[in-house]
């Protein structure tokens, strides 16, 4: 692979928006390694509007982004590094609606809002799940963009009547940065409206949806043009340059679904599975083509698009959300922060494998009293077991982590069988790669070595796509992953020896 001239480094800014926080990271790339510097972090989370609906305060996110970009510019100047690109990634499915003047109609709904309850079943009565899957390849999730649109888009809806364009969250931010409206394909593949084979909007699904739901007849015209990762979106608007102190920096499309960026930076071998571990765990394989069989649909696997024409064949399983919500509830009850390292150490000392709950149950999706929900789920398995395992917080944490590891192991085993791939290792990237107990339990549950890291996989993937787009690095995915191996600390967990 080619590299930058000796001693010369370039800067790339990754705007990484998650469901609980957003960050602005400066990636300093010399062609062989990437150094990441956090330049801004700000909270995120759904807020209830006057009707009790959950929405994202994207204007607060925008203020955090501008502050982070200003800080990134300061850091780059201190280091003598030129910022050559900016890329945006975020969580999937949620979107903003723009009116004819390009203004946001309302704050975007959160995928956890209850407005989609029951909507998928209504849609499937008109366009079956099997017909959906044959085109979009997506597992059943009740909150995809399609189902949100059915819940909120109709001719009688005042907001929808004003809509000229729909932009997914990272594309909305890119629009505010540049003034150009596009849809990056990896995130667009989570909408339910894309053809997994052609990587284009599905005329078939859109026509059938319009026929079934006349209020959505104009949806196709509201969807922007699709672009692949690495495409130039545009340069910073003058107002953004003034607000941040940055120059005429190019904004580049990256793998804007955060999981797509994370998988791009997972140093995978040809037969490795991955777990992108955060609020959700995205568990699966990287494939050259989608798997659209009936068996795959029945197993509820999804085909989301990845970098360089790849497919992320995966299942969304519950991630650290359940544990995080328990910790939040305990901190609120105690009036003090929870000692999470101490809690995890105590959980490791608990007997394992006594109880596995279905962490993918709908009862765990919404915020709320998560300790009680987990306790109730255990109770449904038997009162004696309930009293034995949930009497202490460490025991409850052990139940959660055992259950998460088991869910990931099941997903890997099923993906392997459905795709015809013999998996020889598991790569865990993202925040969950720092949870040593969960990594060890995953190695035991899968019977495979687990390689943990990088923690900052999403930001690394974001930066590397930008760096390749402008020629600072070159090569295919293997070459990009060589840069990751040189840049990140990886840790290996071996499965327990079999007796």
Model-assigned labels for residue ranges:
Residues 74-111, 136-143, 174-195, 227-228:
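Short beta-strand-loop/turn "lid" adjacent to the catalytic site in phosphate-handling enzymes
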Residues 2-5, 13-14, 124-136, 147-168, ...:
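Active-site core segments that coordinate phosphate-bearing ligands/cofactors
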Residues 109-128:
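Short alpha-helix plus adjacent loop in nuclease-associated cores
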Residues 89-92, 229-230, 277-280, 425-433:
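Glycine-rich beta-strand-to-loop/alpha-helix junction loops that act as flexible
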Residues 80-90, 165, 418-430:
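Short glycine-rich phosphate-binding loop at a beta-alpha junction
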Residues 1-106, 241-252, 446-448, 477:
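N-terminal glycine/serine-rich phosphate-binding loop of ATP-dependent small-molecule kinases
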């Amino acid at each position: 692979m080619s590299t930058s001239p000796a001693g010369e480094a370039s800067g790339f800014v990754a705007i990484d928006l998650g469901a609980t926080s957003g960050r602005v990271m400066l990636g300093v790339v010399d062609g062989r390694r990437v150094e990441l510097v956090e330049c801004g972090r700000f909270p995120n989370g759904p807020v209830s509007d006057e009707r009790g609906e959950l929405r994202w305060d994207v204007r607060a996110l925008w203020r955090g982004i501008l502050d982070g970009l200003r800080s990134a510019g300061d850091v780059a100047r201190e280091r003598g590094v030129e910022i050559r690109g900016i890329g945006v990634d975020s969580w999937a499915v949620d979107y903003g609606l723009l009116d004819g003047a390009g203004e946001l109609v309302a704050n975007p709904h959160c995928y956890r809002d209850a407005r989609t309850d029951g909507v998928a079943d209504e849609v499937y009565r008109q366009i079956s799940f099997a017909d959906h899957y044959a085109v979009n390849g997506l597992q059943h999730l009740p909150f995809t963009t399609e189902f949100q649109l059915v819940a909120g888009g109709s001719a009688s809806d005042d907001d929808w009547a004003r809509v000229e364009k729909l932009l997914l969250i990272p594309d909305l931010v890119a629009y505010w940065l540049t003034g150009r409206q596009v849809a990056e394909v990896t995130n667009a593949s989570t909408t339910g409206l894309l053809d997994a084979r052609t990587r284009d909007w599905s005329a078939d699904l859109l026509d059938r949806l319009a026929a079934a739901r006349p209020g959505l007849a104009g949806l196709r015209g509201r969807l922007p043009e699709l672009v692949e990762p690495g495409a130039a979106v545009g340069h910073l608007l003058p107002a953004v340059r003034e607000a941040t102190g940055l120059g005429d920096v190019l904004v580049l499309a990256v793998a804007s679904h955060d999981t797509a960026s994370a998988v791009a930076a997972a140093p995978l071998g040809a037969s490795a599975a991955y777990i992108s571990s955060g609020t959700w765990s995205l568990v699966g394989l990287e494939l050259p083509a989608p798997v659209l069989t009936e068996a795959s649909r029945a197993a509820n696997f999804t085909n989301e698009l990845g970098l360089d024409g790849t497919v992320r064949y995966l299942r969304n399983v519950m991630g650290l959300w359940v544990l995080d919500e328990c910790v939040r509830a305990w901190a609120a009850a105690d009036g003090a922060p929870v000692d999470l390292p101490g809690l995890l150490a105590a959980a490791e000392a608990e007997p394992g494998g006594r109880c596995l709950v279905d962490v993918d149950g709908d009862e765990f999706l919404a915020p709320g009293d998560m300790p009680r929900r987990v306790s109730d789920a255990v109770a449904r398995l038997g009162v004696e077991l309930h009293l034995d395992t949930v009497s202490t917080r460490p025991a409850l944490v052990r139940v959660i982590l055992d259950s998460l590891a088991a869910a990931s192991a099941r997903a890997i085993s099923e993906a392997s069988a459905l795709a015809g791939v013999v998996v020889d290792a598991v790569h865990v990237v993202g925040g969950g790669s720092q949870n040593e107990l969960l990594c060890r339990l995953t190695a035991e549950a899968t019977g495979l070595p687990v390689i943990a890291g990088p923690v900052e996989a999403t930001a690394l993937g974001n930066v590397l796509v930008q760096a390749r787009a402008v020629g600072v690095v070159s090569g295919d995915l293997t070459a990009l992953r060589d840069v990751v191996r040189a840049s990140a600390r990886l840790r290996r967990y071996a499965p327990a020896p079999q007796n």
